[in-house]
Amino acid sequence: MMMVHSMSRDMMNRESPDKGLDSGKYVRYTPEQVEALERVYTECPKPSSLRRQQLIRECPILSNIEPKQIKVWFQNRRCREKQRKEAARLQTVNRKLNAMNKLLMEENDRLQKQVSNLVYENGHMKHQLHTASGTTTDNSCESVVVSGQQHQQQNPNPQHQQRDANNPAGLLSIAEEALAEFLSKATGTAVDWVQMIGMKPGPDSIGIVAISRNCSGIAARACGLVSLEPMKVAEILKDRPSWLRDCRSVDTLSVIPAGNGGTIELIYTQMYAPTTLAAARDFWTLRYSTCLEDGSYVVCERSLTSATGGPTGPPSSNFVRAEMKPSGFLIRPCDGGGSILHIVDHVDLDAWSVPEVMRPLYESSKILAQKMTVAALRHVRQIAQETSGEVQYGGGRQPAVLRTFSQRLCRGFNDAVNGFVDDGWSPMGSDGAEDVTVMINLSPGKFGGSQYGNSFLPSFGSGVLCAKASMLLQNVPPAVLVRFLREHRSEWADYGVDAYAAASLRASPFAVPCARAGGFPSNQVILPLAQTVEHEESLEVVRLEGHAYSPEDMGLARDMYLLQLCSGVDENVVGGCAQLVFAPIDESFADDAPLLPSGFRIIPLEQKSTPNGASANRTLDLASALEGSTRQAGEADPNGCNFRSVLTIAFQFTFDNHSRDSVASMARQYVRSIVGSIQRVALAIAPRPGSNISPISVPTSPEALTLVRWISRSYSLHTGADLFGSDSQTSGDTLLHQLWNHSDAILCCSLKTNASPVFTFANQTGLDMLETTLVALQDIMLDKTLDEPGRKALCSEFPKIMQQGYAHLPAGVCASSMGRMVSYEQATVWKVLEDDESNHCLAFMFVNWSFV
């Protein structure tokens, strides 16, 4: 940008920060001087005083300008640059708002038409009811039949059988009909659309999302703004496997140019089944791409059936043929760049072919909206923001590489869940129980996802083994369960099994022959890699700290790493699937690293009612919840809270020919132990009878009563004050309840000189502050909770604590188990003494804490 060659006297007086300058003096810069200053500005927009003096010495043409005037020039230049960027940003926001306003006006017109249709139908229904009331029952029945016949005559089905749909002209006729039906759904009133809860339009929102009501099959519709050109959007969305995680493959079997400049494609699509309880689906469709007269680009698609005519699709022995009704996407260019995108998905998944308990999964427009329609819109927005540079990831990884990792994790997990024969999977003999299915694959190079090739396995004929199971969960929010599995891995995972899985990446892959039950617990550190724009999915690396307690355990002593994908942790998303998928990786973390994914997927099936004000975002106190739970299996929920979800578990391991049976036995036992752990977690999460959110039970074991007595007595002994004030009681149960419900966070940590202090007990407020449970509390170390100033303050006061018995720490900041920062006004630390006056532990009381 060229600067203005002269500045007025008033502007100089107004901009100059130096009151000592002559108010009648101003500087006229020559083009050469401006060029020299611009060169320096490009290298360093804010030069120091020494740099400005050096500039004057190096550039004789600036010798007649005072250093303070050059300082003012750089200030003005930075100001103009900031104004230019702000103006560009405001123009972008203004274009978004104008486009959104146009979109809302069109949506308003569509809704007005829909209201008019409903008013007309209401009047017509009233007329029919009035007419029917004046006739006999038999005549009214006959009138209904006649009315239905008249309606069918007014809306005759097109007679596709009269045309030859096996030639280009016949296919073009089908394509034009599909286009008309799709446009009537995307911008018209062909479907009764109802806006999804929580999906509100705005310049930064995902867009307008609606689902169908009372239509054949299930349907979803979305429209929003994307900052990409229409042809680029079409290119992205046509590549369905890149954004639809349930899409296994898309094969274009024929491409036929249409006479109007469009293109007709015959496409065979295979979809993954989301669980082990139902067969996968496939589609045989015609896809039509063309430009409209207004400059919009449209891609519509529909199934070819015996009713529509057309070529017969490939046979599907392992799939159930589903029907795609006219669907697609309409892309309209925006003034000033970008596009307005309309997406419609309308399918019939043949729900009657699945077990009754699973039918809600195939009959839910909400689930379709989240898995397909919203996923497509989010993917395009993600690409747009990555292209514009709005999204940047650390670690030097390109966004496309990180997206590929996420796709490979999901694809590998889907391959394991489905176990297709053409991928090389075959069932393995059962051990007598049918709760866990084990399949083996001796040719993993066949996998369509190529998440690992033949080089991944040794040349002596090794393979991949998968143990999987599905179970129904009652009243367990998927988001809460996935968050728990992610944050508290030590409560369900076996360190020995993790070590065995990680061993497949090393030079001697089977150095750990078998996992031992109850492997050593390990601390996990979660390192974030990337997060999608809407924060619905996150990619991260998990470091599992290794331990070795004896010489034979040296194989377990090294740290292990997992590449992990977590999604669906937002409890407010309706119909969302929650998933936690991970795979062992080595320290190099290469872009083409082989991945063998395992994990969990929880899909909501239905929700008959939601308890008022219920929130599952509460502490999952497994120990006390299981101890205090008295509900019998199958007991009805008096609150009417009755929603179900299906959990799918799949774990993959490598094996050689000599260890196949032992690995299979280990995998079965491991999956069964995980199922047992999840059942315990589910009991703690599910609402209790009698209240919407029942309070967590206070642990009432003799050890807990003794510890509380020691904590209270030691506090009084050291400080001379009562921990509970004037309301203090001496009975054990009352004292326990007072400590448990204390308003300040009270925590105990171990007092050992040869190991890092870990927390051993906390009251309810302490658990809330650390965002953990009594069981998981023992995995949290004190030094990882306190920040650096807090650790220094504790170290400086530690001699005083040991001598005097207590000390006060100043206000500071600590971290919860989820990484959230917590501020507190003061912390009191005191020694907890046993009855014989020996040291038992340290107690901490954090006063007036809050999340930052």
Curated annotation (Swiss-Prot):
Coiled coil: 80-122
GO cellular component terms, semicolon-separated: nucleus
Key words, A-Z: Coiled coil, Differentiation, DNA-binding, Homeobox, Nucleus, Transcription, Transcription regulation
Domain of life (superkingdom): Eukaryota
Composition bias type Low complexity, residue spans: 149-160
Biased composition (Polar residues): 130-148
Compartment(s) of residence: Nucleus
Record feature DNA-binding region, as residue ranges: 22-85
Subunit and partners: Homodimer. Heterodimer with ZPR3. Interacts with ESR1 and ESR2. Interacts with ZPR3.
UniProt free text on domains: The ZIP domain (80-130) is necessary and sufficient for the interaction with ZPR3.
Protein name (record): Homeobox-leucine zipper protein ATHB-14
Originating gene: ATHB-14
